[in-house]
């Protein structure tokens, strides 16, 4: 395990990592590398807080399961029973959607629908805005017909828990999950950085170097707390793993019936060729906050977490009484994939001798094959030369535009060109460029992954002028859900 961690750190040049393993109920090994903030001199420890991101979802599900045990709600309760003002786009879905549906990604919405109200940070969207926005997000598929990952319904789940429990979500999570399990260092809601033993800063690459982006003095209570807002150190995450592998470590915390419900396959998930090739997997499904599959004939319960500059993985192998946690504070998706796979194979197929180098090469071959097949890489128009857009040629597009859930944006002359600016998400601002006969936005403070096409439809046939957006890179993070936006022109540009 130590060699695998070292190999991943060396190959990907990581600024730091925290990894721990539990076997037979005991913490057997800790591997800590690097600094909480690159160049800061403070080493990563078992108490250093990392954003666990979507590994929060299993904690939210556990909170709800505790409330089911307490008789405060039932999994098949209509959401509207607890949140009377809750609305989805279709009335029949509003009536039928149950508490369980909030946790299993079966809403019919597209992947990451509404995530632009959560990221990039900071922005001015509130938890109430996010929930109200669901009434305006048009589904891509029928309710309960297929899997598509979402975050916003976990935010709704947090509010259901708050309504049933009579206290804010963060208070309940601390009381019902952190305190009884001894996860005393974990943080959710608003908290002071000075009150934590150590806090890992997210890192991004700048000119070939890792640059830390530390928190301010106070970490605010963010709308996405129930979907991905928890921070924990490695020690506390290993306590989380221990109680799932051995309920005897937390007697009475959760009934056997609810433990079974959480780890039941509620929603089939599409299984990739990689899962078949690497792991000989036969199924893939979502439980309540957990992903369920098999690796080399062994059951695996796991989840990952991804936020800008923070990646995590929690993997449980219950039949082997083993599990491990990976915490990263850099944009290191491939590093997480490679290390998680390598460590899992140490348990499920130790005789195969799979190494970090093996999976690094496998990912490279996979990418090369996808590029050759034309299923990966930027399309031709995204690679075309770019030039500043001309305001005169965009006259009909200039003005103020409004989307019913995202709010107002402006497309207006500025600095000798044209700028796109969001009123509520200030980092979604940048110059408008022309490329391949189309227009796009190159956001000032975001990477090329965030670039977005702007497509204009003039007024006609009784319909107003409309502005829509789309990802320039089809492989970009689905949380840039531009495709869910539909702007209508509401006014002229204000002279600067």
Outline where the language-model segments fall.
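Active-site SXXK
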Residues: 2-5, 19, 25, 49-79, ...
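Short, well-ordered beta-strand elements
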Residues: 313-316, 320-329, 466-469
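Contiguous hydrophobic, core-forming segments of folded domains
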Residues: 322-353
